[in-house]
Every structure is written in C-alpha cells, then in structure tokens.
Amino acid sequence: MTGTTTARSDDDSWDIASSVGATAVMVAAARAAETRSASPLIQDPFAQLLVERAGSGAWSVLASDGLRQQLAELDPDADRVMQYAVDYQAVRTRFFDGFFERAAHAGITQVVILAAGLDSRAYRLDWPAGTTVYEIDQPLVLQYKRHTLDAHDVRSACLRREVPVDLRQDWPAALQREGFDVAEPTAWLAEGLLMYLPTEAQDRLFELIVDQSAPGSRIAVEAVGPDNDKRQEFRSKMRAHFDRARKLAGMDGESLDVGSLMYHDENRTDVPQWLAGRGWTVRAIPAEVEMAEAGRPGYIEEDLRGNTLIEAELKG
C-alpha cells in the first residue's frame, strides 16, 4: 500500500469553514439535499440553514437543486459522486437516528454526541422528557451552530449542553462539569469521527468512554475501512469532481483535500472486537449492506468497501 500523510498536527483547531470543521458542512449539505429529495430517508429541517450561513464551498452545489441540475448536465460522473455522498450520509444518519430511538425506548435519557459538528439531533428528534444531550466539539463549531439556529428561533427538543473541548484533551472532566452523571446509562455516538483521530487517540477515546459508561449504556460508531491505494485514488477523483462543482458555483481555488485531514494509520483497533472483549454486546453491519437494505446501494467498487456501522450495549 502506498502510504499517505496527514496535514494535521497534535494541537490543531478549526472553525466551521476550515479543516475538519468544513467536513461538517459537507455532511450537513448532504442531509439537506436528502431532505429535499422526492423520497427522503431522513428529515433534517435545519441542515439547509446551517449550510447557507457557512460561506461558499463545494457544498454550495449540494445545497442548490439548480446547481445540481447544471452539474448533472455538464459532468454526469461528478453528479453521480455527489449523489453517492448524499446516499451514504442519508443511510448513515438513518441508522444512528434509529440507535437513539432504541436507546430512548430503553429508558436512556443521557446522550453524548462526540465531535457533534452540525448534528441537529438535539433539535429534530423526539426525545423523552428529561433527556439531556451533551455535544462535544471545538468551541467555534458549537458557537456557529448555536448562533445560527438561535437567529432563526430554533429551540432544542431536549436539554442541550455544549461541551466546547477538543477530544484530544480532558473531555471527561469538561463533560462532568456540564452535569454529566457517570452513574447513569448513556447513549454515546461517534459518527464520522474515527478517521480524524490517530490510532492512539482512537484507543484512548474508547477507553475513556468505557470508563464513563454505567451498566445499560449504549454506543454507536462508524468504523472506517483500511486505507489502500484504491481508496486514495477514489479520494483524488472525488476531489477533482468537487473542484468542478466549485467552478460551477463560481468559486475559485481547489476543494478541501479531505484525505489530508485524516489519519491513515495501519492496524487500527477493530472496534467491534475491542468492545466485545470488554463485555459489550455488539451488532456490526457493513455500510454497503445497510445501504442496499435502504434501497441506496450506490456504485462503489469492492476495494472501497469496509466502513462498518456499529451498535453496542453494556448489559446491566
């Protein structure tokens, strides 16, 4: 395998328009596009608001049906890549929405969303009375989301607590300062996160989650497949397509190189095995299987598969 390096550093930070923060805008744009579609798998009425105030980027094409139509006519392959991004995010979002619904039905009212980005579940899901949702992310990212939704009088459907801290820092202490109770079962979410952590940080993250989890807790995770030459080639093609989308939207420059923000570490810990070895009951579903079952099989090649959607429970 040809190795790749990351543009990240141990103490880097970002706002919503730069680095890892900009990837949250792309994900929100995909949710907005899915919500506007004829037969949406999800409903995120706040995604469009969050994208529109984030400035210009390749996401502007996803946020505009008119630009998408132009892209489809000028570059069908680029539009197909865009649609795959929308389909994947829709299926992933639906899976984790279901996770929270199941956790709520089990009586869990303490929720932690790690690297929350522009996640709007605190606002759009039907939470039981007494639910507290803790959102952990960079301070400027959380601030942008709060200011944007406050400006439109959008109110959360639960008690929402911001925890403005980097996950490479002492986030458990920050979480507890906001009222988190280690004695209560928790529903944890790590969605679209692990690829942006080096192996050691990923392992430490899960160790801390387990330390903070009372019996009855649940966790949902998106685990990424191993990096290889085929994935690197695919990312390069995607970036070229997004560059064309930017030009269509009247923007200069190149698209964000998402691959340069990731940590392409070999021998990452197998998340399902790791959790099972610590007493968690694990259900792991290949992402392509979940996509097929949702009627969104996509077009990715065999070598690009490998992402896994995971749900686990620590029995009481």
Swiss-Prot record:
<keyword id="KW-0489">Methyltransferase</keyword>
<feature type="binding site">
    <location>
        <position position="137"/>
    </location>
    <ligand>
        <name>S-adenosyl-L-methionine</name>
    </ligand>
</feature>
<dbReference type="GO" id="GO:0008168">
    <property type="term" value="F:methyltransferase activity"/>
</dbReference>
<dbReference type="GO" id="GO:0032259">
    <property type="term" value="P:methylation"/>
</dbReference>
<dbReference type="Pfam" id="PF04072">
    <property type="entry name" value="LCM"/>
</dbReference>
<dbReference type="InterPro" id="IPR007213">
    <property type="entry name" value="Ppm1/Ppm2/Tcmp"/>
</dbReference>
<dbReference type="InterPro" id="IPR029063">
    <property type="entry name" value="SAM-dependent_MTases_sf"/>
</dbReference>
<keyword id="KW-0808">Transferase</keyword>
<dbReference type="InterPro" id="IPR011610">
    <property type="entry name" value="SAM_mthyl_Trfase_ML2640-like"/>
</dbReference>
<keyword id="KW-0949">S-adenosyl-L-methionine</keyword>
<protein>
    <recommendedName>
        <fullName>Putative S-adenosyl-L-methionine-dependent methyltransferase MAB_4606c</fullName>
        <ecNumber>2.1.1.-</ecNumber>
    </recommendedName>
</protein>
<feature type="binding site">
    <location>
        <begin position="166"/>
        <end position="167"/>
    </location>
    <ligand>
        <name>S-adenosyl-L-methionine</name>
    </ligand>
</feature>
<comment type="function">
    <text>Exhibits S-adenosyl-L-methionine-dependent methyltransferase activity.</text>
</comment>
<comment type="similarity">
    <text>Belongs to the UPF0677 family.</text>
</comment>
